[in-house]
Structure formats: C-alpha cells, structure tokens
Amino acid sequence: RDRVSFGMQSAVPAVLRTLDRRHDPAKLPGLVIAARQLGLDVSVDLIYGAPGESLQDWEVSLREAIAMEPNHISAYALVIEEGTKMGMQVARGELPMPDPDDEASKYEIADRLLGEAGYAWYEISNFARRESGEEGCPSTQLRHASRHNLAYWRDWDWWGFGPGAHSHVGRYRWWNVTVSY
C-alpha cells in the first residue's frame, strides 16, 4: 500500500516555533483520517531534543502521535547543522545545544511508550505498528516497516511530495522548498 508521512515534529506549539515549523498540530488528526479514507497507510515523524523541549513536552507529542494510531512513527533526534538558522543561533549563544543525557532519556521514553502501544522498533529512529500474526516476525519484515527506508539504504528511487520533501531518482537527489510564496 502507498503511505503518506506527516511531519508532525511536535504537538507542542512552543517546540514547533523553536524548530521554525509553521503548521498547526491540531489539524493533523483530521488529515490522518482523510489519508486513511483515501486508502493510504500513515506515518508520523517526530523530532526530539529541541532547545527548551521538556521531557513532558516530548511525552505529550508521543501520546498525541500514538492517539492517531498511525501505521508507523519515526522519532528522530534533532541534529543541529552548521550554517542553518538554528546552527547560527546556537553559535551565537541564543540557543543551547541539545543535552545528550536529555536526548537519551527522550529516546527511552519513546521506546517505552511506543512499545506499550504495539509498535516494534526496527531501525534506529523507526517504529512500525505490529499487526495480528506478526508477533514473532523479524522487525524488518513487518507490514508497516518503511519501504522508503529500505529504498534509501539500497539506493532505490523514491519521490517526495510536499514542502521540504526529498526525492531520489537515478543519480539525482533533490528536495522541495519549505517556504510558501
């Protein structure tokens, strides 16, 4: 089945502002319902470790994502890249670097909550919802494990649609702009 991934990142508006994301997290449940009505599998992407994000903020985001019952959840640790807006804010001392101990705690919270909700960890940042009969199945063979992730590691082609989406076809990689005009 085809899958759509929603870049939720966080359910906490203050964290989204720190990440320079402009969407309203309250609209996502309706979009998830619409995607399911179209027959699509749903994945939700989260980012943890934003400056100022508390353990409670992260838990709220995880619980909001789990409540939508997506087939797949990615939980990525924030990486602050040199030359980006956030990288420059950190370099100027306006934002702190993520605390590795805090990030480790957030990963452990994700592993616990997602496991309790029936998601199986299969790749460093990825969790797929187990279906009936998949209890003993190797995690990389789960129905909801991401084919895109497999395609990425095997250098297969994929197309990304929407703001900031990445694509790879042949030897070419590109991404869409995130700013609307």
Regions found by a protein language model. Give the residues of each.
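C-terminal scaffold of the Radical SAM
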Residues: 1-181
